[in-house]
């Protein structure tokens, strides 16, 4: 479903992570996002998870925004996390549109989770780039059972622990703790 929403906007879609390992270290996310960025041929690269969606009606606005801010290294979008059809939250603002044409040296290795864009070793801050009012919708929890969510959260907690030596705010390495 998510891939379909990108087709009207994108010249190409690079799909990564099909052979995602069951157990991994947290920095794996940034490495595969970077591989996709590096292999992309377009002027702009959207760093999108498979559960991120644009609404079709927003695609013409997104195209105009990309043209308007063609000298910016990134564009930040508000991200809405959808839990159920009637329950959601504004999760964050995130730099998802990355200007590869003007800034091919962007890396996806920043922030606390090591996947946010950096330029010359410095995090591209949401406050330093254009912020648009076109939301990205994250439907992660909507399409999965509680059991699958718990299993995935435990797997991600173990990856975090391998990277940083603790579980942080992720609970623990079992579905019951995560």
Residue ranges: model-predicted function:
Residues 27-34, 55-178:
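Catalytic-site signature of metal-activated, phosphate-bearing donor transferases
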Residues 49-53:
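The conserved acidic donor/metal-binding loop of glycosyltransferases
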Residues 22, 54-55:
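Alpha-helix N-cap/loop-to-helix initiation residues
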Residues 1-47:
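Active-site-proximal specificity loops/subdomain of glycosyltransferases
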């Amino acid at each position: 479903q998510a891939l379909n929403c990108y087709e009207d906007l994108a010249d190409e879609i690079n799909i990564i992570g099909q052979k995602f390992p069951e157990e991994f270290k947290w920095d794996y996310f940034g490495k595969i996002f970077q591989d996709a960025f590096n292999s992309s041929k377009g002027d702009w690269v959207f760093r999108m998870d498979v559960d991120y969606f644009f609404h079709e009606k927003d695609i013409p606005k997104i195209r105009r925004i990309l043209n308007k801010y063609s000298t910016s290294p990134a564009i930040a979008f508000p991200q809405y996390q959808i839990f159920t059809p009637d329950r959601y939250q504004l999760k964050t603002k995130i730099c998802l549109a990355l200007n590869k044409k003007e800034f091919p040296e962007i890396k996806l290795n920043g922030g606390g989770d090591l996947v946010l864009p950096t330029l010359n070793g410095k995090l591209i801050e949401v406050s330093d780039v254009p912020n648009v009012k076109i939301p990205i919708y994250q439907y992660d929890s909507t399409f999965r059972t509680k059991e699958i969510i718990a299993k995935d959260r435990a797997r991600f907690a173990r990856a975090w622990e391998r990277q940083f030596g603790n579980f942080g705010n992720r609970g623990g390495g079992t579905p019951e703790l995560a």
